[in-house]
């Protein structure tokens, strides 16, 4: 069997690759009883004293490298910061590894590095180490970022802890990142204002936690979109999730173009959103806090967790249907 791009596009195919090839061949996958690789959460943890170091890594290859709303540099910082933030951690520092193709435009490289700098300042996260390689074996720049954060011991927020009755909240309009990439890459003749939502969301999440909101589970709906994130949360938590079609925040533009192209916005990648499972009693206050922040102005309560069924069910005007985990992200090379 040959590896295809689908194996790195989120969804069922990537999950199978990770479990059947990678996990089964690695034996030491956690430290000091912390959250390890086998959990397949957004980050791992290393307990030290009364704290836990939260650690994650992300590789980024996107085509085009500059797109409406962002670029590969902003994407690299945001993706890693967000993986730390959805664990309830305070992001502290990043590493930066660049694999640059021979012949790459120097002005483009400087533009990317400046974007990395601006995004790290926005997130208030330092870039403290790195590595640079120039290669004739790649066709475009690849950026890998590792990140560390900190959280009180035992307070990391897992994606496997959704509780019955929890409100399911998404922090804003979905589908924008993947669609912005697709339209920019393929040159569709659409007049559109769609831009990627790529942004660090650590300050948004921090605000919710500071207010004492009980978040039982969190995930950022990147590759595979909202459908992938909700299915992972439901499966790992051994619970069902019901969502309501008319509550899911989607801009008219995104919905219209998805309809034209035959795409499901639930499966399209986001890079500046968070999905939260929040204690029912805290849900309305959580929504208020999110909407006070520019990155959460379109936040909505989209459903609830239930033991009445497994998996993810969506209620529509014509009835109920199952929301499956996608086979893979319908738009390759988005992150």
Curated annotation (Swiss-Prot):
This is Putative hydrogenase expression/formation protein MJ0676. Disulfide bonds: none annotated. CDD domains: HypE. Pfam families: AIRS (PF00586), AIRS_C (PF02769). It comes from Methanocaldococcus jannaschii (strain ATCC 43067 / DSM 2661 / JAL-1 / JCM 10045 / NBRC 100440). Belongs to the HypE family. GO terms for biological process: protein maturation.
